[in-house]
């Protein structure tokens, strides 16, 4: 498992931004953005955008990556998400470019020990522990 995930912006492949290796904040200031709904995540993005956050064109709020991807593919906005959140999109429909300066998120998986689990939960824990070895 990765130690951290990178934040990216979803872009239509014919958009001029799609030709860039990474996207800087100044390139998003006039774009309609699709942001995650969770306040903790918005707070991280607010820190990244700094004083410009209050002036952003936030067109949609969505925690559903597929919905945000469909909106982006139809020219309705630029979703900001964790890299790979919509990794099954073909690159001829939607590409992802990392934000610069880099912004990352650390993920934590936790579970209670010494309680009965379903077979599916036991298998998931087994898979997670395989990465720790």
Task: Give the ranges of each region predicted by the language model.
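Beta-alpha-beta core module
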Residues: 1-6, 20, 27, 66-114
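Flexible hinge/capping segments at coil-to-helix
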Residues: 1-7, 11-33, 37
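Generic preference for hydrophobic
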Residues: 9-10, 33, 58, 80, ...
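Short secondary-structure boundary segments
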Residues: 13, 40, 82-85
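Extended ligand-binding regions for polar small-molecule ligands
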Residues: 26, 106, 110-133
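Alpha-helix boundary recognition
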Residues: 29, 50, 72-73, 129
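Secondary-structure junction motif
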Residues: 31-53, 117-121, 125
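Short beta-strand-to-loop elements that line the ligand-binding cleft
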Residues: 35, 54-67
């Amino acid at each position: 498992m990765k130690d951290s995930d990178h934040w990216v912006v979803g872009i239509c492949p014919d958009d001029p931004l799609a030709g860039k290796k990474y996207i800087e904040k100044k390139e998003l200031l006039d774009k309609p953005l699709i942001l995650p709904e969770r306040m903790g995540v918005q707070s991280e993005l607010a820190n990244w955008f700094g004083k410009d956050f209050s002036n952003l064109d936030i067109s949609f709020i969505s925690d559903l990556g597929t919905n945000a991807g469909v909106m982006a593919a139809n020219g309705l906005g630029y979703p900001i998400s964790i890299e790979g959140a919509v990794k099954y999109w073909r690159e001829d429909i939607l590409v992802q470019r990392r934000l610069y300066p880099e912004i990352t998120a650390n993920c934590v998986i936790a579970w209670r020990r010494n309680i009965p689990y379903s077979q599916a939960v036991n298998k998931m824990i087994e898979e997670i522990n395989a990465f720790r070895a």
